[in-house]
Amino acid sequence: MNDELYARLRAELRGEILRDEPMARHTSLKVGGAADFFVTPADRDDLTALLALLAETGTPYLVVGGGYNLLVRDGGIRGVVISLARLDEMTLLAGERVMAGAGVTNRQFVQLLRDRGLGGLEFLCGIPGTVGGALAMNAGAHGGAVVDRVEELLTIRDGEMLQTGRDGLDYGYRFLRLAPGEIIVGATFRLDPADPDQIGARIAGYLEHRAASQKVGFPNAGSFFKNPEGTAAWRLIDETGLRGERVGGAQVSEAHANFLINRGGATAADFLALATRINEAVKQRTGITLEEEVRIVGEE
């Protein structure tokens, strides 16, 4: 089946197609088994063609962003992993609005907004990854959240391009709920006019804060757990005494207790075991069950 699917992918798509691709190459944690196929569609039309082919053949798939909030288990991923990296268009619109594709990096997006004097999403400068990934998890920092600036979300579902205004979205702290099979391809954002120098100063301040508080020095996925209501996950972890705790090559960062880092040679199983140890300790001490902020996928 994989040989037949590979032949059709190569014949019917224009984007890059990789076979038996180690997901450790595509995640910031640098762990994860191989995907049967790793496909980067050339554009929206290519993505539409790919989804039609996968539906026809009954092939499972998983969409990924920049891999910064993703933990892939050591058994890898069956079917097709879809990268939206080539959906990287940015278009300036009237009225302080910008359309950004899902594959645009947060850094690129923030730089464009700064240069054009458009404020409101400066906090994205310290969040690695892509606009699509930021939307999918409603990324936020410094009191801001990305979906709050969305005017219209662009998605594809069942081969149809959809446009949904923010009032029609179901979202909250670190989540944006989509229909099964619905894929984010971009969004139109409404920003505020602002002086580019003031925007740049805010960006510099956010980056300075990030460097001071999150300089961990090893591969990581950012905050591993969501903050429970009314408190911070890092504080709960720190109070258990697990800062610096290690399982195999995975370790609780000495610099930030909610960052789990790859000290070298870590496996996904190491991270999962360490996360379980943390959660058990926090629950025993406080009664709180921590919820992972990272997305955990793949086979054992």
Swiss-Prot record:
Give the GO terms filed under biological process for this record: cell division; cell wall organization; peptidoglycan biosynthetic process; regulation of cell shape
Residue limits of the FAD-binding PCMH-type domain? Answer: 30-194
- Entry's PROSITE patterns? FAD_PCMH (PS51387)
Keywords from UniProt, A to Z, are: Cell cycle, Cell division, Cell shape, Cell wall biogenesis/degradation, Cytoplasm, FAD, Flavoprotein, NADP, Oxidoreductase, Peptidoglycan synthesis
Pathway membership: Cell wall biogenesis; peptidoglycan biosynthesis
Question: What one GO molecular function would you report for this record?
Answer: FAD binding
Q: Where is the active site?
A: 174, 223 (proton donor), 293
The subcellular location is: Cytoplasm
Give the EC number(s) listed in the UniProt record. 1.3.1.98
- Which Pfam family, an example, fits this chain? MurB_C
- Cofactor(s) listed: FAD
Q: Which NCBIfam families match?
A: murB, PRK13905.1
| HAMAP family listed in its UniProt record | MurB
- Which family does the record claim for this protein? Belongs to the MurB family.
Record protein name field: UDP-N-acetylenolpyruvoylglucosamine reductase
Task: Give the taxonomic lineage as stored in the record.
Answer: Bacteria, Pseudomonadati, Thermodesulfobacteriota, Desulfuromonadia, Geobacterales
What's the gene? murB
